[in-house]
Amino acid sequence: MSEDHFDEEHEGHGGGGGSRHPMAARFRGYLPVVVDVETGGFNSATDALLEIAAVTIGMDERGFVFPEHTYFFRVEPFVGANIEAAALEFTGIKLDHPLRMAVSEETAMNDIFRGVRKALKANGCKRAVLVGHNASFDLGFVNAAVARMDMKRNPFHPFSSFDTATLAGLAYGQTVLAKACQAAGIDFDGREAHSARYDTEKTAELFCGIVNRWKEMGGWEDFDD
């Protein structure tokens, strides 16, 4: 299904008639929401979702975007989930840590989706579009969790995304998150990396920096369509 066909089938989700909110005008009715997941492996169908964070994006009166609200959850592995030892070693996640305080996938996804829907309404947008560093990975795990729970109200577009690895490669010649942030003048602490919350907040800073830099260079105008 093409994106245009998907849009036609889902018109009416979000702001109605009248003048559009500047955010809706900027991204054709879509609200960027930055997401990062930490997982038990690479296979979204079989491997556990262990952490998820989301940052909604706001826009100021001058049309510059900024990270707005952060949502973060440590997640209990779903029943039968695969967890690779190498994945835990890479992320540093300790499943038996007494302060981990994980919640179910259902609780995590419902709370994040509730916050995203609130942001959609506030910005007059019809749907969220996932922003991620190597976004297809994060979107795959979000979609897999939605499918496992048979969730009917997923605010995210099922296949469109903004990938900051690609955007940073264009803007700064860097595709690794830490190096891209450094090139953009964003502090990045490697000791905090691979926490979903930290990576999401840094990805949000990077995305906003690239979008705002493009605006400052005169690369986008509010064209009516």
From Swiss-Prot:
SMART domains linked: EXOIII
Q: Which cofactor does it need?
A: Mg(2+)
Q: Name one GO cellular component term.
A: cytosol
- Source domain of life is Bacteria
One molecular function GO term is: RNA exonuclease activity, producing 5'-phosphomonoesters
EC number(s) reported in the record = 3.1.13.-
| Chain residues that bind Mg(2+) 2 | 36, 38, 194, 199
Q: Which residues form the active site?
A: 194
Does the record carry Nuclease as a key word?
A: yes
Subunit note: Homodimer.
| Protein's UniProt name | Ribonuclease T
Q: Which organism is it from?
A: Pseudomonas syringae pv. tomato (strain ATCC BAA-871 / DC3000)
